[in-house]
Design a protein with these regions (language model features):
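Active-site helix-to-loop segments that bind/position phosphate- or nucleotide-bearing substrates
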Residues: 3-120
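Flexible, glycine/charged-enriched surface loops at secondary-structure junctions
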Residues: 53-62, 137-153
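Short terminal or interdomain "cap/linker" segment that borders an active site or interface and mediates
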Residues: 98, 145-191
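Short, well-ordered, mixed-charge alpha-helical segments that flank or form enzyme active sites
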Residues: 102-104, 127, 158-162
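Compact, glycine/acidic-enriched structural inserts
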Residues: 115-137
Length: 191
């Protein structure tokens, strides 16, 4: 296989984008009072202490026939992924996580305080997006003068989520960063 997964350089999380977190909660800044924002800040501090952000990636050559797209030996099913990668000769395959301790923290918090667990879950969504953004930036720095599309994942459009295990296996994500999939194709850790 042409995929030789690269372990990530370290990623340090910055303070999380509050507007993104509030959006995940279905809220606006105007709806959040000082007491709520203090609670959110406390949850963020705790979440960031537990997060161990990591990612792995590899760069794969793309080959096409009339109706089929391959990234290395991986068949990429669906019209949407083919359209997304139209004009590209390579694809970056990436997996990222905040680590299992974030899932454990959210699960434990859920047993004691559902509101804080909900806040932490939204914060974790914001945090994993930040990890992916920083990973993407680091990857782009290794490939100057290349065009990059936006990220596309199994489950988007008609790109089947059932492809998740194949992509993660190609990256050796279980060994590289500790990500596996469940029987229903969800990633574990969740974030």
């Amino acid at each position: 296989t042409a995929c030789n997964p690269t372990m990530s350089p370290s990623i340090c999380l910055s303070p999380l984008d509050r507007s993104d977190t509030l959006r995940y909660l279905g809220m606006t800044e105007a709806a959040a009072d000082n007491a709520f924002l203090s609670r959110l800040d406390a949850c963020e501090a705790k979440l960031l202490r537990h997060a161990t952000p990591r990612y792995t990636y590899c760069i794969l050559p793309l080959t096409r026939t009339e109706s089929v797209l391959y990234a290395d030996t991986l068949l990429l099913e669906g019209n949407d992924i083919r359209q997304h990668l139209e004009g590209c000769d390579r694809a970056v395959l990436m997996a990222a996580t905040l680590g299992t301790s974030v899932d454990v923290l959210i699960d434990r918090t859920q047993k004691r305080d559902m509101t804080n667990a909900l806040l932490m879950d939204a914060l974790a969504n914001t945090a994993i997006e930040q990890v992916c953004d920083k990973a993407e930036q680091q990857i782009q720095e290794t490939m100057p003068n290349r065009y990059f599309t936006w990220r596309f994942s199994p489950g988007y459009g008609d790109f089947p989520i059932s492809e998740q295990p194949n992509l993660l296996a190609h990256l050796n994500a279980a060994r590289q960063v500790g990500i596996i999939t469940t029987e229903t194709y969800l990633m574990n850790p969740r974030k």
